[in-house]
Structure formats: C-alpha cells, structure tokens
Amino acid sequence: MRTATLYRYSVPMEAGVILRHQRLKSRDGLLVKLQQGELSGWGEIAPLPEFSQETLDQAQVAAECWLQHWVSGVESDDSVLPSVAFGLSCAQAELKQTLPLSADYRKAPLCTGDPDELFAVLQALPGEKVAKVKVGLYEAVRDGMIVNVLLEALPDLTLRLDANRSWSRAKADGFAKYVNPALRSRIAFLEEPCKTRAESREFAQDTGIAIAWDESVREADFQVEAEPGVAAIVIKPTLVGSLARCQQLVQQAHQAGLVAVISSSIESSLGLTQLARLAAWLTPATVPGLDTLDLMQAQVVRPWPDSPLPLITTEQLGVVWHR
C-alpha cells in the first residue's frame, strides 16, 4: 500500500535577503512524504525565484501528477523540472534507504556586508578556514579591496567568491587589480565572474584567479571538462535535478580533476540536512556550501544540528495533496 502527501510551507526571511533583482521576503516550497508499508521518505521541492526555470505552482502540478502515478504503482521517469526531480528522488532514496544517513554539517560561512563582521565569523572557525563572499552586489573595486583585506588579515583563510555573472570584463579586471597577486592563490575559486563563459575563461587566464562554473552547469550546452583556470563546478541540486544527475556531475568533475561543491539554493532545514548527507556521500573531501539557514526565521520538520531557530512541524503545514 502506497500513500503520498504534499505539504506547502512558507518561512519568513530575514530582512535584506536579495536575489538577483528582488528582495526575498519568504521562502516558499513543498515537502513530499512517500509512505510504503512501514517505510517513509521525505523530499523538498522549492524552486528558487529568479534562478529556477520553473515556478512553485508549476512544480506543484508536476509533483501531483508524478505522485498520482506513484500511488497507483506506476514508476514514472524523473520530472523534467529540476526542483521536482530533486525532491522526489530524495524521497524515493529515503524510502529505499539508499541516501546515506551520515552528513557533512561543515559549512563555508556566507559572509556579506561589513568586513569587521567577517573577521569575527572567520576567526571563530575551527579547522580549515573556508568562507564564501558574495561579490558583484557593490562596486567591483570595493569587492577587491575587501577580499584583499580579508586574505591579508587571515593568513590561513581560503575564500570562495560568487559573482553570479554580474561583471563586465572591465569590472572584473577592476576587482582583480585590488587583489594582491601574491594572495590570489588563496581564492579557491570565483564563481562565474563575467557575463559570458568566454570572458570568464580569459579573466582566469589573465589574472591567475581560478574560476568555477555555477550557472553554466545548468545550461544545455555545458560539458564538464578540464580547462586552464577552471578549478571547480558548483552543483545546486534544486536547480540541477535528481540525485542521479548530481552523482553524474560529481563523477564527471572528479574525472576531469575538478572540485565539485554541493551547494544550497536556500532550501529549508529539511532540504539542507539532505544536502549535507549528499555532500558526505559524494564529496566527502570538500566543504559544502550550505550556510543559508540563518537567512530564514524558522526551520521546517527536520532541524539542522545546534540551530536555535524554531521548528515548524508537519501539523503546522498545509496539506495540498494526499492519496
């Protein structure tokens, strides 16, 4: 006997969470629960506005269609919508007990804004000091100066930077100009600095600052391959698709000598704990990019270890579909 339930959640965000062009006031998504006999499995379906190709309403329609088949005993292919494919594959993997329970709760702290705040966060980090800084929100020159100050002040720090394709080549060069060439090797990678892949490649080769592919990974013509100046690919499962697709990308990256980083698309605590398990399984040597829970005002169903945020339970969620 199979049953399935689809819940919808809405969690208020902290003030000041800005995506590409809009403020994100709440994080909205779906949780799916599959049940078969004594076993159950959960997954999260949460398209990220401005980044996902699908809307939440479109994802809900696709999920309901897939679940209708599943409860009838029909095994459907993965959804073509990445967030749906990811959430449903997680629920199936939990049900079949194929998603390992051990998790990598390390996170590269996400630093924005005040450099003084960054110092405090980074100096409190135990072990390997890896942090992520969003660049491209302010002036490129200012970003370069902040990165340089951080690397100078903390000699054991490695930074991951993310520009979200926000710079022209000239602005990217303006950033690099303010980062001491002797410190550039401690930039693990800069995600997609320029508006085109060609410009980003040239930037990496001209400046010695390694880059990573992020948005490119989700584009139809993208191939994982070793290239001069490219250090990593960033895999955001909500934007990429099923667990099998994520596994394929990680294997391709490792075969090409690239680092693969499992990264958050601002999922709820339930989705984040599953990403931590995925990271421990597929990329155990790499700190995942999962430091997004503190952008929210609550956790959902499953808590992240040691988080002080209140937990929303299943009883507090709206059921949008059940069979």
Swiss-Prot record:
Its EC number is 4.2.1.113. It catalyses: (1R,6R)-6-hydroxy-2-succinyl-cyclohexa-2,4-diene-1-carboxylate = 2-succinylbenzoate + H2O. Mg(2+) binds at residues 162, 191, 214. Keywords: Lyase, Magnesium, Menaquinone biosynthesis, Metal-binding. The active site is at residues 134, 236. InterPro entries: Enolase-like_C_sf, Enolase-like_N, Enolase_C-like, Mandelate_racemase_C, OSB_synthase_MenC1, OSBS_N. Coiled coil: none annotated. Its cofactor is a divalent metal cation. One of its GO terms (biological process) is menaquinone biosynthetic process. It comes from the Bacteria. CDD domains: OSBS. Pathway: Quinol/quinone metabolism; 1,4-dihydroxy-2-naphthoate biosynthesis; 1,4-dihydroxy-2-naphthoate from chorismate: step 4/7; Quinol/quinone metabolism; menaquinone biosynthesis. The keyword GTP-binding does not apply. GO terms for molecular function: magnesium ion binding; O-succinylbenzoate synthase activity. Converts 2-succinyl-6-hydroxy-2,4-cyclohexadiene-1-carboxylate (SHCHC) to 2-succinylbenzoate (OSB). Belongs to the mandelate racemase/muconate lactonizing enzyme family. MenC type 1 subfamily. HAMAP family: MenC_1 (MF_00470). This is o-succinylbenzoate synthase. The lineage of its organism: Bacteria, Pseudomonadati, Pseudomonadota, Gammaproteobacteria, Enterobacterales.
